[in-house]
């Protein structure tokens, strides 16, 4: 708090600081001073704003700074300290998640499918407080084929039939009934056939027009690969307690499919598949997930990297409107400079292709100027000096 007589002084100081500091920082400083329990004097107001301006000014990037190489070094150097392991996720035996350097490489390489795709699915109010309802949603999500609920299969050559022994425990675990299995088989175009069910959950599938054992084996494989329920790509869905609500963790990812399931909070669904985010939500969302995923990987390893380096990497990867990898098939391979492309990888190919097209080197970037020994246009090299000689 401050004395009433010092309020005009504070307002004047706020006005002056607004010319230098972002408005949010100025507002935060003002609220901090007004909400303090002790009285803040004019000298202390001066010290607060002077220190904020000093720290902010030191944090600014100087004109001409080589921000690209600084960002590369700032992320690459901590990357050498990362572990190369795949970790179990939160102590759950069924789920693994790639962390450390392998995950960082996946992100900057913009891989279409991560090595361990997974989703964190939040539920709507109706489902998130009740474990049974959350389990109901999880069972809708989990992709289940007939082979997942079968303990054994056999073929009766005499009657030309396929025998499926269903596993009652797996049926219960997956939330599937024998009728669900029969309906899934019924949807297949298998010709003329009949299903007989015995008391021990055994299905005997008799075919009328099959006279080849090879055809029978093919039909068996087709039946075992038949979908009963779920979203393609979601191999496993596990309900977990987080705070006062239940969430679902999945092994596998299918963002567009999951969003259509009743009970899923579409505003809170998370996936580590950057390409899916780009396809479903667009390039801005993809940029955001790149920033979040890189930050998470570094934080999990206990590494502190300035967010601006990560922002720059994400901006470069997404600036064309699509997610591009940082490599010869993406950002580096699409540089305008022939020498810059050749300096990275497959040198001869780039030079031959450029010669065949008649490309011209403009020498506007850093790499190409270093190659031929020209001064680079960074730092003091950005300035063109002229000298007026003193005539005597």
From Swiss-Prot:
The keyword DNA-binding applies. It is found in: Cytoplasm. Its main location: cytoplasm. The keyword Transcription applies. GO terms for cellular component: cytoplasm; DNA-directed RNA polymerase complex. Keywords: Cytoplasm, DNA-binding, DNA-directed RNA polymerase, Nucleotidyltransferase, Transcription, Transferase. Pfam families: RNA_pol_Rpb1_5. GO terms for biological process: DNA-templated transcription. Its EC number is 2.7.7.6. It catalyses: RNA(n) + a ribonucleoside 5'-triphosphate = RNA(n+1) + diphosphate. It comes from the Archaea. GO terms for molecular function: DNA binding; DNA-directed RNA polymerase activity. Belongs to the RNA polymerase beta' chain family. NCBIfam families: RNA_pol_rpoA2. DNA-dependent RNA polymerase (RNAP) catalyzes the transcription of DNA into RNA using the four ribonucleoside triphosphates as substrates. Forms part of the jaw domain. Part of the 13-subunit RNA polymerase complex. This is DNA-directed RNA polymerase subunit Rpo1C.
